[in-house]
């Protein structure tokens, strides 16, 4: 948990959402070890998790309760809401931290993960997003935090959610999966992903990922992109198939516990970070590997 080194700073959790969901989430959050209080605010305007209604709520809570830190995951939702909250609080955001050195000092990757910057914030309110894979998860059981309801007041709604389409998959979620099989542009088509990557992923009970090159070529959905501008993953096992290993891709998966690379180019950069590498034609090696599993 990023609370290490910050004493009592991270003991409060904010849950904002519709009344039908927020209270159940607040109850679950109250059981997380290390949380002393859960603040829950309900409004139908919060249900879509849009930045416009939620950022002013964060601003109001910080100012009324004199909080010194605002912390959120460096997720799609966090990257949307927290920059707006930082502007409301007249603070400079520190993004994607991987280490907490003190109440005002954080470490974050730069240059696609090729260097680490130690950043000290001099703002009165520190606004931070956290790379979840860099910290051990807090236990979801054993806590006994109190729950306090917060009046949402008049909620601004300059935008509204028109449509939400959820993707359906029987595979694990890419961001949290313990095993990931990713394919690159060498698959040559979406049919290549379906024929070679998906069966291997299913045998390993793994999530499917893709390089940016494969996504840009239309071989895989954007939601499957792993890398600096996609999802940051750190599974127990990461299998890279036909991925050369551009620094932007490595930035999204190099913290994986075990990395296996399959590529016909022995000079591919992916082999520099791989724990195990196979120089082979993926069209021959992957079906054979899948069959033997």
Question: Model-predicted segments: where are they?
Answer:
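Single conserved hydrophobic/aromatic residue that forms the stacking wall/gate
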Residues: 1-10
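Short internal beta-strands
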Residues: 11-18, 39-40, 207-211, 260-263
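A glycine-rich helix N-cap at a beta->alpha junction
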Residues: 28-50
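Glycine-rich, anion-gripping cofactor-binding loops and their flanking helix/strand elements
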Residues: 46-60, 110-114, 217-253
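N-terminal glycine-rich phosphate/adenylate-binding segment common to multiple enzyme folds
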Residues: 47-135
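Phosphate/diphosphate-binding glycine-rich loops and adjacent basic-rich segments that engage nucleotide
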Residues: 110-172
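Glycine-rich phosphate/diphosphate-binding loops and the adjacent beta-loop-alpha structural elements
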Residues: 166-228
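C-terminal functional extensions of proteins
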Residues: 237, 243-293
């Amino acid at each position: 948990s990023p609370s290490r080194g910050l004493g009592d700073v991270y003991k409060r959790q904010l849950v904002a959402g519709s009344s039908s969901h927020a209270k159940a989430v607040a109850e679950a959050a109250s059981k997380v070890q290390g949380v002393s209080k859960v603040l829950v605010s309900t409004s139908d305007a919060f249900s879509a998790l849009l930045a416009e209604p939620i950022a002013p709520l964060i601003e109001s809570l910080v100012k009324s309760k004199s909080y010194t830190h605002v912390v959120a995951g460096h997720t799609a939702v966090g990257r949307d809401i927290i920059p707006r909250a930082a502007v409301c609080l007249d603070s400079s955001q520190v993004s994607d931290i991987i280490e907490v050195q003190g109440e005002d000092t954080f470490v974050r990757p730069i240059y696609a993960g090729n260097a680490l910057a130690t950043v000290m914030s001099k703002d009165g309110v520190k606004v931070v997003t956290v790379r979840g894979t860099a910290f051990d998860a807090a236990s979801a059981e054993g806590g006994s935090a109190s729950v306090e309801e917060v009046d949402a007041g008049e909620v601004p709604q300059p935008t509204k959610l028109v449509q939400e389409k959820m993707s359906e998959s029987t595979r694990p979620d890419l961001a949290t999966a313990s095993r990931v099989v990713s394919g690159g542009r060498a698959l040559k088509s979406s049919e290549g992903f379906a024929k070679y990557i998906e069966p291997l992923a299913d045998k390993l009970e793994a999530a499917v990922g893709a390089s940016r090159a494969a996504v840009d070529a239309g071989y895989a959905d954007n939601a499957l992109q792993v890398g600096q501008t996609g999802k940051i993953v750190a599974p127990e096992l990461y299998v890279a198939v036909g991925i050369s290993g551009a620094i932007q891709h490595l930035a999204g998966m190099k913290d994986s516990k075990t990395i296996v690379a399959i590529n016909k180019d022995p000079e591919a950069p992916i082999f520099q970070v791989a724990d195990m590498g196979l120089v082979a034609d993926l069209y021959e090696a992957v079906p054979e590997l899948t069959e033997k599993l």
